[in-house]
Amino acid sequence: MGNCCSDVASGAGATAGVGGSGSSAALGATNDALDYYLKSKGFNGLFSQIELSFSASNLRDRDVLSKSDPMVVVYQKEKDATLSEVFRSEVVLNSLAPKWIKKFIVAYHFETVQTLVFRVYDVDTKFQNSREEMLKLDEQQFLGEATCALSEIITKSTRTSTLELKRKDGFAPQAQPHHGKLIIHAEESLASKISTEIVFRCSNLESKDLFSKSDPFLVVSKIVEHGTPIPVSKTEVRKNDLNPIWKPVFLSVQQVGSKDSPVIIECSDFNSNGKHSLIGKVQKSLSDLEKLHLAGQGINFSLPTGAGQNKVLKSQLFVDKFTETVHHTFLEYLASGFELNFMVAIDFTASNGNPRLPDSLHYIDPSGRLNAYQRAIMDVGEVLQFYDSDKRFPAWGFGARPIDAPVSHCFNLNGSSSYSEVDGIQGIMTSYTSALFNVSLAGPTLFGPVINAAAMIASASLAQGSRKYYVLLIITDGVITDLQETKDALVSASDLPLSILIVGVGGADFKEMEILDADKGERLESSSGRLASRDIVQFVALRDVQYGEISVVQALLAELPSQFLTYMRIRNMKPIPP
């Protein structure tokens, strides 16, 4: 399954570069800069508020005259592997099977691996009247610990995980059979399911550009106590428009706190250098915006002045649409049995450099330091593997000449002629390293064949009624030479349960690649004039994020849940309760 073979004709016919139109490229760069600007200010992808409940069974009895008095403590593993305490339950007296009442509220972010460590302690009787947060843990008796990713809990059909408790030294439960079990149950908050659709319109905006009208966009930010407002949503940029109407903005109540929590709506004139000019801003709650819609009234923007006052402007903001609906969430689909299936395609063209030389993008460092391709595979794969039950991933290479064969633009990374799957992320890494020594780097850079191979798998799965959504990661160092063929493949694939993540490595000019990312411009159009039914591409240049606060995996995966939900809604597919 998933086998793809040499495409000699494509290779011979695509040796020259194919350029996009200047306007499309400019539009792509424009919104790419906007996305980077927002992410630098804290804008993240879809998230859900999760409530974790705890109980335990068969805990070890460490008290002589009574049963243990257990308390559970939760830690979050940070990037540097240190543990930060984030929660303590109450103490349950005299119980080896406690059911704690206190809940742990955590924000689930799909694009990161949120590793949690749970430790259970027997609280000494002499501390019975002390507040839990004042207890010194080194003065309590340790009963056992367990570790898991938050995604492992919420992807189970029952949203309940039973974890074996073990000693801190890592001894297996079989060696110490009396540590007991910790049961964790997850519930998604109702606020995660309430979606507000808002259509904003403005009138009489000030022109900030010298020779043209402003290019306005809106950013909606929530207000946090003692902190900088955090962006939670944005509109597209409207070119040369002083009376713009934007596409709908979707907000969940939890994103802003509550319906009565104030939000700041800023209207700015876009500049490609990232220095956007503020046109004006307003501060209102969702309830206020609903009232404006019902009354058909606008509200005037204001601008802060140097004297600490606000200057009221003639420019106004209107709410043309305001509707609230309870919708199915990403987590509801996962709990009902939907899976995300990971696939990867790796660029083996000669522009990567000789793999045996240290300056090659494909160089395998004997010290174990990962190259850019290995980092992208690990970073994305480590997140997505939790959503795939069998963890068998199709893996391809393109742009190379296998031994005694012509140049192939889609060959199985494992060397097989009949199947493309490998076992786990480590299987991809091993096959990638092996392939480097079994193929000759060639060219040109063609995406069409690997996209079509992924689309064939997604199409077959859809025909079988499988509850699977596929995610293809393409890692490349160069500009594609089959731009129109790639557009055709993407437009066709937009009807399938498939998203495509593209990572650009090295120093190439990736402007043409940004054209493929439809959220940075108009929808893709095929050579026959057909438009893509939805956006399925997310592109990130590794150099743009590797030194910032936003990781490549966050930048890539932030939009994936939204793409998944868009597909489900277009096809009217609903999660069937477990």
Swiss-Prot record:
Gene knockout outcome: Dwarf, twisted leaves and enhanced disease resistance in cv. Columbia when grown at 22 degrees Celsius. No visible phenotype when grown at 28 degrees Celsius, or in cv. Landsberg erecta, cv. No-0, and cv. Wassilewskija at any temperature. Humidity and temperature sensitive lesion mimic phenotype, accelerated hypersensitive response (HR) and increased disease resistance. Bon1 and bon2 double mutants, as well as bon1 and bon3 double mutants are seedling-lethal when grown at 22 degrees Celsius. bon1, bon2 and bon3 triple mutant is seedling-lethal at any temperature.
Biological processes, Gene Ontology terms: defense response; positive regulation of cell size; response to humidity; response to temperature stimulus
Domain VWFA as annotated: residue spans: 341-560
Principal subcellular localisation of the protein: membrane
Induction per the UniProt record: Down-regulated by high temperature. Up-regulated by pathogen, calcium, low humidity, avirulence gene product avrRpt2 and salicylic acid.
GO molecular function, one term: calcium-dependent phospholipid binding
Residue pairs linked by disulfide bridges in the UniProt entry: none
Listed result of changing D215A: No effect. Loss of function. Loss of function, but no effect on targeting
Subunit structure: Interacts (via VWA domain) with BAP1 and BAP2. Interacts with HSP70-1 and HSP70-2.
Other remarks in the entry: Overexpression of BON1 has no effects on pathogen resistance.
PANTHER family: C2 DOMAIN-CONTAINING PROTEIN (PTHR10857:SF106), COPINE (PTHR10857)
Descriptive protein name: Protein BONZAI 1
